[in-house]
């Protein structure tokens, strides 16, 4: 059904052609079903999603009681998504909880995550205000699904009570976990070349102020089971790696586990400069990185290698080690 696309393996002594299935734009796409296998009965059931032609079923997650599952359906134009709940025993649609559209595209990247202390509430991630943020859904409180205009130029309809937990000109990149005692969500966020770990309270919406004192850096985190401490692994432009144990109550360093030395210490290294230029819309900042040779002379002309990757989901210029240069 899906057209084969040839890939040449140049690592073999004699080049070999390996065909893969790739749904090229405008050509036939595969028809996918979502099935559930029960090991105790050795039987399969399939969700009654209707005709699967030109429909994608993504970001599947189980309900805490395992009696239903959730998925985010995307049309092939990828400009309309629906968050749906299906019965895991019958495969029937139970309810639609949310819809979102955009003239260009809508891009759900993460399955919903239920609160560990309340199986009627879950976190949904959306870019409907222009940045990826966290939204708290309360499935107990049903509302009439009116259509609203999004800040990013699209529309949305919600069928239950929804509260936006994070907001600002920055984006949530990863949910690390929860602190059930404090009712906090611990997450990683990015603003330009800055990144860091933060917490937002699901009860009152309060959070430690993002990026108020952050430096340009690139952070990765590993949270403990109770959500009280995390291992913060990060780098800056000039520092290859720092690993700290961090208390998530105030996000203060508790113990420094590692401060690595530069592997290039004593070597002459090219200079690295960063900055921004405006995109075609005249508003959006596009970050760039310039690397100059050690003996750079501004009065001379040099050949230039220009590398651009338009994405998505690949931040080439970062606040981390050597600003992301390799």
Task: Map each language-model feature to its residues.
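Predominantly five- to eight-bladed beta-propeller fold
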Residues: 1-46, 150, 241, 249-262, ...
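Beta-propeller fold detector
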Residues: 45-48, 93-99, 145-167, 208-212, ...
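Conserved beta-propeller blade repeats
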Residues: 19-33, 50-74, 80-88, 93-125, ...
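Short loop/turn segments that connect beta-strands within beta-propeller blades
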Residues: 38-42, 88-90, 139-142, 201-205, ...
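Serine-hydrolase catalytic core recognition
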Residues: 2-6, 66, 72, 212, ...
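Structural motif
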Residues: 2-7, 31-33, 78-84, 130-136, ...
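Glycine-rich, acidic and aromatic/proline-enriched surface loops and short helix-turn segments
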Residues: 33-41, 128, 282, 307-311
């Amino acid at each position: 059904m899906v057209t084969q696309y040839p890939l040449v393996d140049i690592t073999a002594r004699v080049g070999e052609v390996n065909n893969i299935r790739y749904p090229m734009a405008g050509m036939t796409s595969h028809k996918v079903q979502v099935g559930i296998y029960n090991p105790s009965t050795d039987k399969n059931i399939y969700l009654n999603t209707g005709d699967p032609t030109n429909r994608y079923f993504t970001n599947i997650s189980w309900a805490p009681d395992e009696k239903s599952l959730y998925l985010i359906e995307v049309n092939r134009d990828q400009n309309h998504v629906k968050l749906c709940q299906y019965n895991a025993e019958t495969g029937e649609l139970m309810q639609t909880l949310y819809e979102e559209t955009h003239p260009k595209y809508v891009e759900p990247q993460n399955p919903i995550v239920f609160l560990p202390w309340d199986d009627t509430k879950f976190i949904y991630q959306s870019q409907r205000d222009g940045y990826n943020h966290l939204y708290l859904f309360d499935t107990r409180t049903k509302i009439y699904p009116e259509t609203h205009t999004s800040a990013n130029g699209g529309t949305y309809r919600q069928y239950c009570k929804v509260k936006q937990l994070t907001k600002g000109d920055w984006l949530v990149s990863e949910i690390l976990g929860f602190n059930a005692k404090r009712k906090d969500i611990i997450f990683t966020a990015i603003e330009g070349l800055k990144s860091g770990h933060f917490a937002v309270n699901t009860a009152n919406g309060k959070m430690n102020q993002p990026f108020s004192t952050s430096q340009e850096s690139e952070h990765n985190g590993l949270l403990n089971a109770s959500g009280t401490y995390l291992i913060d692994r990060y780098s800056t432009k000039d520092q290859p790696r720092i690993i700290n144990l961090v208390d998530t109550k105030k996000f203060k360093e508790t113990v420094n586990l590692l401060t690595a030395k530069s592997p290039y210490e004593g070597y002459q290294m090219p200079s690295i400069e960063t900055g921004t230029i405006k995109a075609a819309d005249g508003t959006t900042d596009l970050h760039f990185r310039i690397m100059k040779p050690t003996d750079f002379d501004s009065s001379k002309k040099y050949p230039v290698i220009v590398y651009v990757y338009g994405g998505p989901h690949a931040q080439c210029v970062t606040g981390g080690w050597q600003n992301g240069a390799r």
